[in-house]
Amino acid sequence: MGGDIFGRELRLISFGESHGPVVGAIVEGAPAGLPLSEEDVQRILDLRRPGQSELVSQRAERDRVEILSGVFNGFTTGAPISMIVRNEDIDSSYYEEISRFPRPGHADYVARLKYSGYNDFRGGGRFSGRLTVSMCMAGAVAMKILEKLGIEVMAYSLEIGGERAEGFTLDDARNYRYMNPVRAPNEESYLRMAAAIERARREGDSLGGIVEAIALNVPPGLGEPIFDTIEGDIAKAMFSIPAVKGVEFGSGFRAARMRGSEHNDPIRVIDGKIRYKKNDHGGAIGGITTGEPIILRVAFKPTPSIAKPQETVDLELLRNVEIKVKGRHDPCVVPRAVVVVESMLAFTIADHIMRSMRGAI
């Protein structure tokens, strides 16, 4: 099973399964001398941990990180940083019962085809949102690199179930997003989004939504044309997050309905520096960062595990059946995905910084 490594100079190796003993991350290429503790990583993990409100999964995981290597006396050594989180609240009996009935919207069927039935299917195995634990652990390391360079990465729930956040500032989002369980940028949108999630939960259904992410103070010149563009690598990082169905930068798909005279961002001298007057390009042109904020939006599908009856098949008897998915699932993955988006955005930018600086920061 491949596809477990992300990055070039800064590399994340993800391992583990949803119902296995651990979920882990190995980060290779991090420079020596970064201050890093288990508390630093734990702070990021706690932002995605389940069971923190009725609006998310009630799986009772502590998600306590253990750093096994690569850190000594509170600083990175330059060696690979290996980290694990132990899976504690596991009940696989239901997944044994339904192994012959692939769940609609999940990777059960395609995984069975690809790996001839040898894959660990419990809780979705390698395809579970549980694997975002490894992304958050790696993101904590990347954020230390960005912090040293004054780069800030933030994300928030822009839209859930058609309820879109409005009337907020960047400071509103920065200060409020982790003060509410929905990760909304202001109180008004939080109340609407929370009510929508609760309605779907009561009805045995689920919702999708959009996470907006911004990276500030990113230097110009990161990225390469054609196959190593900054947007391409960020998009790949986002699509590695389970449930992601779309990514757009700047004006995104709205650009298809604009004229060139509207979309082109004027270049001006502002306070003695060359800047763009607006940012429809979203922080990158030609695959290379411009120095303006990187702005992207990530679309998440509704959680496929729902309590309503769904049509599927019996793989052994080859007949059509109905299934009702049980378990402790998020009625909407968006709130817990916000910090995962931040983590993977931070990791991608840090990787490109390491490329441009040949590993020295």
Curated annotation (Swiss-Prot):
One protein family per Pfam: Chorismate_synt
Cofactor note: Reduced FMN (FMNH(2)).
GO cellular component: cytosol
Gene3D superfamilies xrefs: Chorismate synthase AroC
GO biological process: amino acid biosynthetic process; aromatic amino acid family biosynthetic process; chorismate biosynthetic process
PROSITE patterns: CHORISMATE_SYNTHASE_1, CHORISMATE_SYNTHASE_3
Keywords linked to the UniProt accession: Amino-acid biosynthesis, Aromatic amino acid biosynthesis, FAD, Flavoprotein, FMN, Lyase, NADP
Reaction(s) catalysed (UniProt annotation): 5-O-(1-carboxyvinyl)-3-phosphoshikimate = chorismate + phosphate
Disulfide bonds: none
EC number: 4.2.3.5
Domain of life where this protein originates: Archaea
Cofactor(s) required, per the database record: FMNH2
GO MF term set: chorismate synthase activity; FMN binding
Binding, FMN: R126, F127, S128, G286, K301, P302, T303, P304, S305, R328
Residues reported to bind NADP(+): R48
Record pathway: Metabolic intermediate biosynthesis; chorismate biosynthesis; chorismate from D-erythrose 4-phosphate and phosphoenolpyruvate: step 7/7
Protein biosynthesis in keyword set: no
First-level EC class: lyase
Role of this protein: This reaction introduces a second double bond into the aromatic ring system.
Classification via PANTHER family: CHORISMATE SYNTHASE (PTHR21085:SF0)
Recorded family membership: Belongs to the chorismate synthase family.
Name of this protein: Chorismate synthase
Gene that encodes the chain: aroC
